[in-house]
Amino acid sequence: MRPAFIRGKWLSRTLELATGLGRRTCSSRESGREVRVRFAPSPTGFLHLGGLRTALYNYLFAKKHGGAFILRLEDTDRSRLVPGAAESIEDMLEWAGIPPDESPRHGGPCGPYEQSKRLDLYHVAAQALLDSGAAYRCFCTPQRLELLKREAMRNRQTPRYDNRCRHLTPKQVEEKLSRNSPFVIRFFLQEGAQPFQDLVYGWTQHDVASVEGDPVILKGDGFPTYHLANVVDDHHMCVSHVLRGAEWLISTAKHLLLYQALGWQPPQFAHLPLLLNKDGSKLSKRQGDIFIQHYVHSGYLSDALLDLITNCGSGFTENQMGRTVDTLIQQYELGKTSTHSALLDLDKLPEFNRIHLTRWIEGTETRVQLVGQLQVLLKDTYKDLELDEKHIERILLLRKGHLCRLTDLLSPEYSYLWVRPSVTREQLQCLTSEASKVKNLVVRLLQENDSGFTLETLNGELRKQLKQVKDTKYSSAMKLLRVALSGQEHGPSVAEMLLSLGRQESIVRLQNALPD
């Protein structure tokens, strides 16, 4: 969408539309009664670990203070938008258990929540800055800007705009507009920026005018840059606190100058230290395992991923394993956030997931969810398999504490749970000459018990019964039974295998492996 101009002015219809949007501005910040925070990713890619961490800390802060968590999509870089990314970002937040209160999907009082649908607001703000002299039109061509960059590089200087168009006279501007010369709008950076207090980094000051040229705030296609858009949107959405990555700390001075030029009260800022790999290197999208979708498809629980992310950072009195989102909300304190980068050790994720999966298996409602998920996984892997929910639930309870992921049950070592192994009589008889006697003792034990065993009582009964086998060590008898039941020499205890398979299936397998 290209903005409409009449000799450099926005069309009056645009002003009317924007004024209507402006009326939706919330008033809670002025009253000081409501905390409102936002997570504002760009759908130029899918949600990654760094983004999830920023979203999580915003969510925790909002819920800790009874406030609102907003999802806003910064989709103004139209050339880099990735199809499906916008929808996926919100999907991943919902999967993680930190759903936004206001978003493109759910709406809200301060929408729309995509920047591409809020252009009128940016146009009005840009015009206000032009009218007050806080911004100006820049007619410099891309070729001239490239020459400036090359010259700076040649002199080993940081490239910066030389603010040339800042000094154009009104007559010169009028002449260029009359020729329909393309332009962008730049913000007039004032020297001597005032210090501000960041809620994490403390008092900070960056005189951006001394190191940067005047920044572009509205591009030639009518879309804003981040600097203008985030200020306008945070104001109109009445954001009370901005929690974002530390990479934006230096730019905050620039944003505060924009707030001042527009006559708006700024929110409070808290910049979160970067999330890095455990060796201190930057998280890279080339790693493959940086995207949240990877962990969803790999069978990890969202609780485990959030738990790991908060354990590697700060914001809590102490680190603990096994914390749920509700616990994180209770324990989170923004003031305890460190300025040191957070080192993420993804090698610990399986152990975090084991702890949370154990808790899910113990919970009645969450166990039902796991049973349903496992049924779907089994159906995809074993097309003709028919298992009742009670059978699957029994397996989960028996394997509680041993599984790192639900998908572990689809690995070859657990295949015996779902398909009968191929075992020959010769394989078993080479383990002991009393193979048939061992089998008959265990089959009779299973047939004669109607009340059911626990793992402990079955272990005791097996040991008692197998004392009748005089020439076979107990360990050899266990190995024989394990191979007959599973086709494997190693794995869970024989008692657990018998309980997992159930009485009838266990008897069938033993008799098939060692027919009379």
Swiss-Prot record:
Residues binding ATP: H48, E247, K282, L283, S284, K285, R286
Species of the source: Xenopus tropicalis (Western clawed frog)
Gene3D superfamilies documented for this protein: 1.10.10.350, HUPs
Name of a matching Pfam family: tRNA-synt_1c
Reactions catalysed according to its record: tRNA(Glx) + L-glutamate + ATP = L-glutamyl-tRNA(Glx) + AMP + diphosphate; tRNA(Glu) + L-glutamate + ATP = L-glutamyl-tRNA(Glu) + AMP + diphosphate; tRNA(Gln) + L-glutamate + ATP = L-glutamyl-tRNA(Gln) + AMP + diphosphate
Motif ('KMSKS' region): 282-286
Name recorded for this polypeptide: Nondiscriminating glutamyl-tRNA synthetase EARS2, mitochondrial
Function statement: Non-discriminating glutamyl-tRNA synthetase that catalyzes aminoacylation of both mitochondrial tRNA(Glu) and tRNA(Gln) and participates in RNA aminoacylation for mitochondrial protein translation. Attachs glutamate to tRNA(Glu) or tRNA(Gln) in a two-step reaction: glutamate is first activated by ATP to form Glu-AMP and then transferred to the acceptor end of tRNA(Glu) or tRNA(Gln).
Transmembrane segments: none
Cellular-component GO terms for this entry: mitochondrial matrix
Cell compartment(s), UniProt: Mitochondrion matrix
CDD domains per record: GluRS_core
GO BP annotation list: glutamyl-tRNA aminoacylation
Enzyme Commission code(s) on record: 6.1.1.24, 6.1.1.17
Range of the transit peptide: 1-39
